[in-house]
Amino acid sequence: MTELNKLTVADSIKGLKNKDFTSAELIGAHIKQIEKHRNLNAYVTETFDLALKQAEAADQNYAQNNARTLEGIPFAAKDLFCTKGIRTTACSNILKNFIPNYESSVTQNIFDKGGVMLGKTNMDEFAMGSANITSCFGNVISPWKANDDNADLVPGGSSGGSAAAVSGFMASAALGSDTGGSVRQPASFTGLVGFKPTYGRCSRYGMISFASSLDQAGIFTRSVLDSSIMLEAMMGFDEKDSTSIKAEVPELQSAIGSSMKNMKMGVPLSLGEGSIIEPDIMKMWQDTIELLKNAGAEIVDITLPHAKYGVAVYYVIAPAEASSNLSRYDGVRYGLRVERENMTLDEMYEMTRSTGFGEEVKRRIMIGTYVLSSSGMDAYYLKAQKVRRLVANDFNNAFAKVDAILLPTSPTAAFKIGEKQNDPTIMYLNDLFTIPASLAGLPCASVPAGLSARGLPLGIQIIGKQLDEYTVLKVASTIESGVKHIKFEPKGF
């Protein structure tokens, strides 16, 4: 029998319904795995007492035939989803001991469906990073190793703790947030399915903000079916979030295994020209195109002429919004306060923020403050907003001809911890292929599609039309079936 902590969400639900095991046993297996692999630093707060209590309630519901959709299923939450009475830090010193008195809508939705929370996962500070190396709790180590080297690898970022937890069988699923690729890129690095829904599909209420016009909750799972199950539970209109979309939550599970016949897949191959894309990634992209063609899809060459400006646009707009959002952390209302005798209010602000924020966060606040200044507004911010509109228009034009778009998730496989740490520009380019869809607010997923020559997982990205998560899942499911001969599982786990 498969170890309980290695079961997918769908198989766990089936086993619990058939009374093959209890939720308490399922949760116990995950707790053992977390304790065994604490060296990966995937979790920053463990909620085992809560999880065992929730598991006991789940077993009672199964006994009484009152089981809900996710009854007894173990999940983890990135540490920027506020959890009532449970420390929520965004992995920043400025919020290191913050305990919210309210619950985020997304975690509440999962609790309402019977989900069991194992803990809060590590992340880049305030979700700013692509390698999970900016956390005040230390970096996360990927469960994966290259077959020619035993060096520790990054799990991707900013949701690296969630990716490591699911990839290392320390959770069946895990919540992340995706601003410019922070679910999709770690999923690619760790051999997982990472899904970012349409902007506004999942409520942002109770999510600690980075860039409000880009932030969206997402999910890590080990199968496309699991993604559809979790998305159905997470999504929905929320009057507490002014950016929430008033649209019915669709039935998504029937997308799994649907035919690709007569589907048109857009492929912007020109985006790979002259970029930093590795040969392994290019081969995986070409192989996936052939896979979809053989499955009945029509491949259409498209262009996204403004997508190449995506990284530049993102690193103007996102820091600008961060500069505004993070101004609330001043040492007055909540979080860290640095004080000394005879200190003025301005000195308290300065010392609190200088001490509380890490280097990458300070860098982005400074960039954002400049582009919002009188000298930077016209030259950078307003121009970036115009180009963002052009990026969205490019997608609209493409979707007039195709049903979905296929791109690599990342230009590289996972790299060594510290390898790119001293060059922010190189680090920012990790999001080269994920940022354009974020700027347009589109649903997208990364699904494992191959292994590099060094044995590391590579993800392919599917981008859909607004509110068309169904088609994204359909394509992802076809790719998943086409590579089922590949085992996307780290050695030793």
UniProtKB/Swiss-Prot annotation:
Give the family per the record.
Belongs to the amidase family. GatA subfamily.
Write the record's keywords in alphabetical order, separated by commas: ATP-binding, Ligase, Nucleotide-binding, Protein biosynthesis
Report the PANTHER family cross-referenced here. GLUTAMYL-TRNA(GLN) AMIDOTRANSFERASE SUBUNIT A, TRANSAMIDASE
Name the UniProt record assigns to this protein = Glutamyl-tRNA(Gln) amidotransferase subunit A
The entry describes its oligomerization and partners as:
Heterotrimer of A, B and C subunits.
Q: What is its EC number?
A: 6.3.5.7
Main EC class the enzyme belongs to: ligase
SUPFAM superfamilies referenced in this protein's UniProt entry, alphabetically? Amidase signature (AS) enzymes
GO molecular function terms noted in the UniProt entry:
ATP binding; glutaminyl-tRNA synthase (glutamine-hydrolyzing) activity
Q: Which reaction does it catalyse?
A: L-glutamyl-tRNA(Gln) + L-glutamine + ATP + H2O = L-glutaminyl-tRNA(Gln) + L-glutamate + ADP + phosphate + H(+)
